[in-house]
Amino acid sequence: MKVVAKNLNFTYSPKTKGLSFRALDNVNVEIKEGEIFGIIGKTGSGKSTFVQHINGLIKVQKGGGALKVGDYDLTDKKCDYKSLRAKVGMMFQYPEHQLFAETVFEDVAFALKNFAKDISAEEIAARVKEALSTVGLDYNEVKDKSPFDLSGGQKRRVAIAGVIVAKPEILVLDEPAAGLDPKGKREFLELLLRLHKDYVKTIIIVSHDMNLVAEYCTRAAVFSGGKIIATGTPKEIFSDKNIIEKSGLDLPLTAALTEKLKSKGIITDSDFTVEDFTEKLIVALKNGGKIR
Amino acid sequence: MRDVSFGSYFPSNSFVHKMDARAKILIAIAYMVAVFLVSAFHFLGFAACLLFVILATVVSKVPFLRVLKSVRTIIFFVVFSAILQLFFNKKGTVVFWVITDVGLLNAGFIIARIMLIVLGASLLTLTTSPVELADGIEGLLCPLKWIKFPVHEFALIMSIALRFIPTLIDETDRIIKAQKARGADFESGNIFKRAKALIPVLIPLLISSFRRADELADAMDSRCYAGSKTRTRYKKLRFTFRDLIGVLVVAGLIVGIVYLNGFYALNSLAEIAGAL
């Protein structure tokens, strides 16, 4: 499923003078199937408003432009939001705050029961088991526990399982790594890559963490004041000083280091992933710290 | 969900805003008593109450529309009570279909009474910040300290509750979105189904409230909060000439209404006497 937004606009409280706020301003973007797409920008730049359009949590306003997700036309009044939401999974910040059921099993099965009314009990059990093992939890060990008795990291895993259990084709993550310790973060990002390989086709990540974007995203869009000011690969975006200045974002560590080492004539360039950067640096060091 | 205008503070520097919160609460209570004192069908009393609210609104510099907005939240309740009066009142003579003249008067009476009370109450919260309001209530409840009632703690609980309303609204919004993304449906089905659909929202909300309460308690502890004993105030409440004027005006209102009531009562007595 492709996400295509054309001249998408959105204004909060459009009728109240003084309170109305234009959150999206002529947003044009195309997110292809199979991408890990980053959405970056400062707080209040319209990122969250945009991603909440993708599964119809925020509806396209009258005259607000066009938005298509796969075959779903979100400007159509008869759009079937429920089946759309089954195909577009969304995880908010601190997803563990959405847990509510008495057992982990019930909580993970929640989305499944909502989306497919006539699903059999065996199938539910099989799907929950699959989802829990995908996020790295032992089904037999946790299924009857209360989700509130788990550790923070485990809670978040259960919450993710509760989203991916519906087998969405697109997974939207809003600040997925917020509040995790470095180890938890690493494990979580590895989980994301695993998910992308054999579970969901497209992942859309909203994040402030430029290191994460540089490392994992195939492409990204930069939001600023409700507009998209740039779209491209992380390499393209972080090489352009204009964009960085306009959006008020930080450079990822690898980009900043590449910049410094380039000015000293130690390396020529890198694509800003940790692997590529260290490789280039090692080659440079083997050559006595000079460009070959 | 965000436009909860009932009970929102409108900052200004007016005469009413500068009044002592204790006096304002007392005046508001006295005003409500006055509204209730207006006896059946004597709309002149309501006119006096309306005049009082309009006067107070003008002096407080709060826009009229802002005060009227507060009525919007209870309009359903008002209309419902009026309809009950219209259709289920059997007294008096029939004017139209099942509607009687007494029913009509009663409906008008109920509408006037509820509207006037809500207008007065919202004017109090529009001109008094939640903190002042809590301070005012604490001040008024002070005599209860004699029977060891924890007045300060009570006021603190109230101001915390008020402070957390917007936070909880935001939180509810977020949780509803998260559950909607998992296919939860709050808009279809009968009332029982809808009530059941709220469980996935209410439980996380309850849990997050406990978490917030814990965090707030820690934050207060780390700032050495120790209750009423050692606490001093930055803004002391003081009874001034403004409050005296307010009290006099509302006292005038009550006296006027009582007088009107007495006048009407005497009149009807005279009528009865004349008929005899």
Task: Give residue spans per PLM region.
Chain A
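Helix-to-loop junction immediately C-terminal to a conserved catalytic motif
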Residues: 55
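ABC ATPase NBD Q-loop/coupling interface
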Residues: 66-83
